[in-house]
């Protein structure tokens, strides 16, 4: 339902896709997802590569001749958070810089997604795209992604050392989107199942969040 309704975490309007495929669509198209470099998921979930420049360099070197599409994080583009790459490096490493572009449309337009720990990697998995992780996001280490960085051993082995079964994508989605979260319907203002949230997001518009929720969101951004 999430994929069919085209609902994502980034459920906002965005600019049209930049011009791609100048050298012909026969080129493999690789999406490289930039992040906020002081975000907790980057600080705690990466080791060998923990910068956007490092990620872009590794991805570009792994795909000589491919079309490298770099998606900067919106907060980095706005100058609010660290993680900017100098224009000279972008010009040398990326074929296209997809500023303010729709993340879902970018995923659909590309053949493969490279990330450190971004949730866009999970969005790409939902849509059947190969994902390469240089960090250890929650969706890495289960056999669903190609992991170039270390992932916690607890995702592969039980405390007694025995290997753990590998979940398929359906089981991961159930754990992440159904079993773990609790959902709140902004219309009825009551707890609700995930299906209701998908309908609300897909068909909107939604009520304006209260001042309390807006303040909580700001605090979450500060401490994330």
Residue ranges, per PLM feature:
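Leloir-type glycosyltransferase catalytic cores
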Residues: 1-24, 144-224
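Mid-to-C-terminal functional-domain signal that highlights helix-capping/loop sites
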Residues: 40-55
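Catalytic donor nucleotide-activated moiety binding site of glycosyltransferases and closely related
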Residues: 56-99
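Short secondary-structure boundary/capping segments
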Residues: 46-49, 84-87, 129-131, 146-150
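A donor-sugar binding/catalytic signature common to diverse glycosyltransferases
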Residues: 100-145
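Short, solvent-exposed loop/turn segments at secondary-structure junctions
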Residues: 39-41, 78-79
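Short loop/turn segments at strand-loop or loop-helix junctions that form parts
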Residues: 27-39, 72-73, 136
């Amino acid at each position: 339902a999430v994929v069919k309704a085209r609902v994502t975490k980034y459920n906002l309007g965005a600019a049209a896709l930049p011009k791609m495929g100048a050298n012909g669509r026969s080129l493999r198209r690789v999406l490289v997802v930039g992040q906020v470099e002081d975000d907790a998921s980057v600080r705690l979930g990466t080791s060998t590569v923990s910068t956007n420049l490092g990620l872009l360099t590794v991805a570009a070197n792994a795909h000589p001749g491919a079309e490298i599409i770099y998606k900067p994080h919106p907060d980095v583009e706005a100058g609010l958070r660290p993680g900017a790459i100098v224009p000279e490096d972008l010009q040398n490493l990326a074929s296209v810089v997809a500023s303010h572009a729709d993340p879902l449309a970018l995923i659909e337009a590309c053949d493969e997604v490279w990330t450190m720990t971004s949730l866009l990697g999970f969005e790409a998995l939902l849509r059947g795209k190969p994902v390469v992780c240089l960090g250890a996001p929650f969706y890495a280490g289960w056999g669903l992604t190609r992991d170039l960085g270390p992932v916690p051993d607890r995702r592969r082995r039980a405390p007694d050392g025995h290997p753990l079964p590998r979940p398929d994508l359906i089981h991961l989605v159930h754990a992440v989107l159904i079993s773990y979260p609790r959902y709140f319907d902004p219309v009825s203002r009551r707890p609700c199942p995930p299906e209701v949230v998908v309908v609300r997001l897909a068909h909107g518009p939604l009520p304006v969040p209260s001042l309390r929720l807006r303040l909580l969101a700001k605090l979450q951004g500060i401490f994330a």
